[in-house]
């Protein structure tokens, strides 16, 4: 009988999770805080979260508040870290340039229009990233065109007519408002079914 009691008392071994030294995440400029998800990720690696947030917010002071920045944090064994802040995410830059808030909802939907000149300027910004330093601008532009296609942004190889673009954006805003209303109605109907 004693062996059964000892088996019950014996606790399961606690398995310690070892996290990697590199943490890759997107953090909004000037908005780093100890709240989830960033705080727990840093705490698990033994970093002082408050000091990290203070340093990150100070270093991103020249960015507009809320801009998503890809960040690489390399944690050293003595609990210090190297912080690498990249340029804003490609999708954010493309959406800002096209003046849209969200990507396409269906396969063949066009949500915005950009010219090759816009893509060239964005490519010059992205070429400052460590990962794209030795990549030619032409190749970066091709990657941006593929991302535009994924988001539903139409790439024009000639200048955009301002009147035509304004009409497109007004029609697009009406369509997005209708889509959001439809989604809200579906969500409300689903909530009514579950109660």
Swiss-Prot record:
Primary localization class, coarse? mitochondrion
Q: Which organism is it from?
A: Caenorhabditis elegans
According to UniProt, the name of this protein is Large ribosomal subunit protein uL11m
Q: Which InterPro entries match?
A: Ribosomal_uL11, Ribosomal_uL11_C, Ribosomal_uL11_C_sf, Ribosomal_uL11_N, Ribosomal_uL11_N_sf
Q: Name one GO molecular function term.
A: structural constituent of ribosome
Give the quaternary structure: Component of the mitochondrial ribosome large subunit (39S) which comprises a 16S rRNA and about 50 distinct proteins.
Q: Which UniProt keywords apply?
A: Mitochondrion, Ribonucleoprotein, Ribosomal protein, Transit peptide
Classification via HAMAP family: Ribosomal_uL11 (MF_00736)
The record's section on PANTHER family has: 60S RIBOSOMAL PROTEIN L12 (PTHR11661), LARGE RIBOSOMAL SUBUNIT PROTEIN UL11M (PTHR11661:SF1)
Q: Name one GO biological process term.
A: translation
- Compartments it resides in: Mitochondrion
GO cellular component terms, A-Z:
mitochondrial large ribosomal subunit
Report the family membership: Belongs to the universal ribosomal protein uL11 family.
